[in-house]
């Protein structure tokens, strides 16, 4: 899925060395200090770790409960082709620019680890070299996580998956041979950049890698099951994982013992009983050979339906049993690197029950968990605050226990304005995404911090059916638009403020309210639709 929808340095050199603000180690002489000539030293051994790292099993305990900084550093299509412009890509899927404050908030709420999905292919030159601007931004976000006192996982994300044009990592023998050199060069660059970071930084080999047919659930599902095709896909997954481990270890330093994460085919977890091949991704996953013992972690993802809670607990419990049977038995722990639900409209009560149960059950079994987004997303990250506070509380209490008291700020704690930066011609800000029954509502009113130039902004109201629209030019800083049922039908499905230019433009929305038939006002929360970025500005 889009999912529509990765430092601190500790090193001893002579007595000890100081780390620069970017987290890299400076040794004597590197900053231009005079160094006295010395006799040629004896040949040095292979570079070793600066510090001893905890084992993979210990890391699961140390990480605590985790969250995904999703739709942030992994977008692969944004309407932009400049892979150096990190801000455009980071905000391209509706998220605010990541800040240290966001990471501090997650730590204070009780989270101990952040998975930072990163896509790389759109940020590399023709020779596979990552643009320095992009690598610097990834480095900066990693530092935010570690500076907050949490663990961090970075990976190769939407370079895998179902997009046939952009997913250049494919689980097949031919796919591996085509991508091997580029894949290994990419991991060499990442590993060298972070070589001296401490044990709180983990690397993840790849995200949800699929076969040539882009099969989910198990290999060779989409084109009619072929045992030879499936075997080739599973072998490729293991080959990619081995390449990853070998390349990272070869860079030396702390990478010699860094805990590394390898994913099953498609990050599939084997759940369900509707096909006899569902367990194949687990049965065919192999622990990569490694120079050091106990520093490999397996990863799967999980998105069960949760409408029937007892059935969910049975299915997910069996799924967790299978991780122990097929993966943990090989000598490595498991993390569920993404989890959530595929239920279309789960009740908050069901979701919170599931979240609390799952976080606690996985902790009991020694399995790590990273919830996929849906806690602080979009403009909420710019304060920062939680947009799903009940869910966040359920997760951390499921892990830490009911006696734990998390700090969970919410939007109601603040008086806010909404600063909108338009970047694209025709881009749109949601004034409201709600479906509006015109028998109950008569219009919408909003206030801006300025009167825009004539023709620059247009109120666009999406009607009941495709092609039914109502438009009105914005001509003042305070506007009221009455609904016209003859143009819209019985309801409005979305109301936006559309930008009619391609020049960068910023304006602040101070308030938005729907007008009910009885003249009472119902406040709305603006949000980015596409082509714009929204920042929340605290006014009091």
Spell out what each predicted region is.
Residues 413-491, 499-521, 530-533, 540:
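Extracellular ligand-binding interfaces
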